Amino acid sequence: MRFVFVHGGFHAAWCWEHTIAALEGLGHEGVAVDLPGHGARVDEESTLANRRDAIVSAIEPGDVLVGHSGGGFDATLAADAAADLVGHISYVAAALPREGRTYPEAMAMRDSEEGEFDADVGEMLGYLKFDDDGAMWFADFDGAWKYFYHDCDEATARWAFERLGPERFGDTTMTPVSVPAFWAADLPRSFIRCLQDQSMPQWLADTVTRRLGVEQLTIDTSHSPFLSRPRELAELLVHATTTTPTGPLVPD
């Protein structure tokens, strides 16, 4: 199998290196995408369309598409644009759009039985800095270690922190998203929750799982299993492709 990896906020393709190496050891292939505004494409404009197109250009027929954190949002847009190419889509502690809603709305909404909006972002904001041009940075190593990498050794956490880049949102926080082809395609799909996650609250992971109509898979890691347990993550991703949905997709 061939896996296409989409990183989350502040990260870039580099974060998947160890997981791809582990997959290759299992007899599979993997490629990671730098989204515009990140990694080798840090100077490119970050828009919903640019990010979607960067992923679509990497997908080959039958690929497994993997989105982490906010990258789940981008991966879904790519799957909407190229549903005929995607063999499976896996969400690793990742976001899922809500039809007709913006990204911040999708991230803040609980299931209806739990109430509408929950905009609490916790203490993490205290570790962020904002440039005059609107770029957002994770400015503090201790904060990154706490929220992203707490189960990594310090050397690994520092290696990752030194590679974090700015997050430039462009239109990604303001534009309502519609992905009708994704909902209609009913693609094979899975969700992996990180049991020690300090970035994605359990209620949000549970909400995304229910909206995907899948049984939740788990890995006992921080928000960044690609660094702390890449071999275990690789094995779980391979297993995820053998699972099938247990219910329908819920667009909103």
Model-derived features with residue positions:
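Conserved HGGG/HGGXW glycine-rich cap/lid loop of the alpha/beta-hydrolase fold
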Residues: 2-40
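The conserved beta1-alpha1 loop
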Residues: 4-8, 67-68, 193
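Active-site loop/oxyanion-hole signature of alpha/beta-hydrolase fold enzymes
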Residues: 35-64, 77-81, 103-114
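Gly/Ala-rich beta-loop-alpha elbow adjacent to hydrolase catalytic centers
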Residues: 66-71, 75
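Flexible "cap/lid" loop of the alpha/beta hydrolase fold
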Residues: 80, 84-86, 90-132, 171-175, ...
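Conserved alpha/beta-hydrolase catalytic His-Asp/Glu region
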Residues: 131-183
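Conserved serine/cysteine hydrolase catalytic core
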Residues: 162-212, 216-231, 235
